[in-house]
Design a protein with these regions (language model features):
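Structured alpha/beta reader/binder surfaces that contact nucleic acids or chromatin modification marks
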Residues: 2-183
Length: 183
């Protein structure tokens, strides 16, 4: 797939740490996010999967995206029933239902980046990205992105999130809320 996606699509760049997680996404159509480390808004249009060092030759890149179909809160025990003795078996996770994985051609390499946590971007940035750094929303667009995410949050009424006040935020605060570090 090329990178033809709506420019205003909301995208969450999510970390894929294991090949097994990629297979779960491909075969069963879901991705898990621990509630305690989840970003503020899960109700986005797409997930873009950043593949870590465990992916061998395909490491440190975004190779796949998937449309988000919905999400629910559950436990790790319910998601991964073959791991009843896992230390986090009773912790809560978002189970994000996704459509089929779409391969990005070419994939988006990390470049100098290696350690990535969740962050938001848009379809416009994804279309033009040559490296992961190109997905970082510029200062002048951060307020627009944050407003779109807040509107989505209000519409979806996600778990445990109350009304959010309308305030103008400084760029550093916006960057932190969007998962952007050191930019």
């Amino acid at each position: 797939m090329g990178r033809i996606i709506s420019p205003d699509a909301l995208i969450l760049v999510a970390v894929m740490t294991q090949l097994r997680d990629l297979e779960i996404a491909r075969l069963f159509g879901w991705y898990r996010i621990p509630l305690k480390t989840a970003p503020k808004v899960i109700a986005v249009d797409y997930l873009a999967f950043y593949q870590t060092g465990s992916f061998g030759a395909d490491k440190w890149r975004i190779q796949y995206i998937a449309q988000v179909k919905g999400h629910e809160l559950t436990t790790r025990a319910e998601l991964l029933q073959d791991q009843p003795d896992h230390p986090r078996v009773n912790e809560e996770y978002y189970k994000v239902q996704i459509g089929s994985l779409q391969e990005l051609l070419p994939p988006i390499p990390a470049g100098k980046w290696r350690r990535i946590t969740f962050f938001y971007t848009t379809g416009e940035y994804l279309q033009d990205a040559e490296t992961v750094n190109d997905l970082i929303v510029h200062s002048e667009d951060r307020q627009i992105l944050w407003t779109a995410l807040r509107e989505r949050l209000d519409k979806e009424q996600t778990y445990g999130i109350g009304d959010q006040p309308e305030v103008e935020l400084e760029d550093e605060v916006l960057a932190a809320l969007l998962g952007i570090q050191g930019q």
